[in-house]
Amino acid sequence: TDISTATHQTDGAAVVLSAPKGVTNALSLLCEQAAAGEDFQPLFNKLNDTVTGIANNLNEELDGFAHASVVEFINSHLSVLKQHLEGIKLLGVAPDNVAAGILSIGEYISVTLFSAMLSAKGIANRVIDPVKYVLAEGDYLDSIADVSLSKARFSDVPTDGSEFLVMPGFVAANEEGEKVTLGRNGSDYSAAILAACIDANCCEIWTDVDGVYNADPNQVEGAVLLDKLTYQEAMELSYFGAKVLHPKTIGPIAQHHIPCLIRNTLNPAAPGTLISNEKSEVWTSVKGISQLDNVTMFNVAGPGLKGMVGMASRVFEVMSNANISISLITQSSSEYSISFCIQSKDASRALTLLEDAFALELQNQLLDPIEVRHDLAIVTLVGDGMRQTKGLAARFFNSLAQARVNNVAIAQGSSERSISTVIESKRAKKAVKVIHQNFFSDRHTIDVFLVGCGNVGTELL
């Protein structure tokens, strides 16, 4: 709360909270156990101990903490949770609409705890229920918010700093008023939505790293923290695997030109990374390298594709109707084949859908059997300055050759802001290291093999 209350004291604040650590995973596992007919009581008890333990600790630390009402809220929600789990156990499946309600319990508990903390410190606050304010459409478990329509609903929310606004993340409602969730990184997405809806001056996302790096610091030694990114650069990096941000999060803040600052809760003194329309004072053609893992590539080919209007759109319509996101697309100039990449978790379903949709063409050999290639990764080079710098593509592919990596497919957008290659997953880590070294490092690593350690060899060592 120190970070949030300090902000409120200077300029007012609104805070979006995610669930306590481990709670969402526990809720997901409870659904799985119940659907499988397993005994979920031990995990349920552990979850109960976790959240009530947080409330008990806060009660000891803060005078005036509304312990009784907080515990009553927790018990009420866990009682409803248990009823849902019993129903899932009888059904043998967790319906998506029920799962959405279950998975969001942690966020509501976080908000209740946080609101009680603020009240104990004498800070006026208001809890915003996103089910009332945030309108979304799509799957129950991965919806997309309609920011324009949602913004109109926020007309009664004070933005003058008189009240500290607190909202659960990860949650919204569909047109029927049913609770839905916003998918991976849902709380960050919720923060961007709230920032847009209340015309915030800045959206700060507090995470467990110092900001956005020019490569994954867990894989690349010497990865450098980026001080600034444009919205477009951030979108490209996040879309192709940068784990700090999700592409959905960038959309609302870019559309409404709201600066977004990525900060570290464990290191609040770190400056973080600013995402805005501003460009870094130090000009660089390339900003970063991202890696998207667990990719499967489909190749749809055959004489039926050439000159046939609408064949490509049919392929993508099949994916769209199944809510399967396509990461990368390439098409041969001969129009004989079209290739695209999706997340591997969707591969089996996608193949079945394509074979059903094109059964007649496959039967009459207008299309070849659909090729599927697993265990791939997409490595992408990103930077606004790429379009003004000649020879970057050559350096990129020379780096891949240096790493002894073959390209499965290549794609570049017309904006020339990024260039991507599809490669084997097992070679991705090596590829990223070599690319980073060639584009960002002044020091280059070489391998030296010394055979025979006589006087000269010993002196060299």
Where do the protein language model's features map onto the residues?
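Hydrophobic aliphatic residue packing
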Residues: D2-T7, V15-V16, I102, F164-V166, ...
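Short, ordered loop/turn segments at secondary-structure junctions
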Residues: S18-G22, P130-Y133, F170-V171, T207-V212, ...
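A conserved regulatory-domain signal marking ACT and ACT-like small-molecule sensing domains
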Residues: A270-L460
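Structural motif
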Residues: G12-V15, T52, A124-R126, E163-V166, ...
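Nucleotide/pyrophosphate-binding catalytic subdomain
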Residues: T1-L245, I250
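Charge-rich, low-complexity amphipathic helices
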Residues: E38, D96, D139-L141, P217-N218, ...
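Acidic/polar loop patches that form or flank catalytic/metal-binding clefts of enzymes
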Residues: H246, H257-N264
